[in-house]
Amino acid sequence: DYDTLRKVNPGLVMLHVSGYGQTGPYSERPGVGTLAEAFSGYAHVTGEPDGPPTLPSFPLADGVAALTGTYAVLAALWARDRNGGIGDEIDISLYEPLLSMTGPMLINFTKGGVVSNREGNRARWSTPRNTYKTKDNRWIAVSSAADSPAMRLFQAIGREDLTTNPAWATNRERLKRVDECDNMIA
């Protein structure tokens, strides 16, 4: 354990990564990335609005926990080198780093009881934002919350008229026409 090893090397930095952390009510439970993606709420907000919660097809929780752990170890090494050579023990669960990705959704739920729903490739704060099939049967991803990229997109699809139309000039106005925007681009 860390306390034993620290006696031999006071500068030791040790990282633990587990499903639910080293302490707490779930600490003894086995944990894998898929469970973390569900437990964190990530799967609940991913997928199409009328579909089931969707898990990523790649090890998202594992990768995010690895990046978080790497950052934590680097920060602990930096602190150790500046604060007298004393190491640290770091505890990261697979699910907690995913909470930072769900950010406002978690806060909206815990503070206001608002449950976020699945939105597919859309975002309630930006339009156009989606994936669209092209005429040559390929797919493109578009995200134009800022007005200038949206105007360039409208020009690219032959809808220059929208670049001077106040109903399409700002993201706020475009959000009133999400379905129309998607249908026009698709």
Model-derived segments and spans:
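Active-site-adjacent "lid/gating" segments in soluble enzymes
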Residues: 1-145
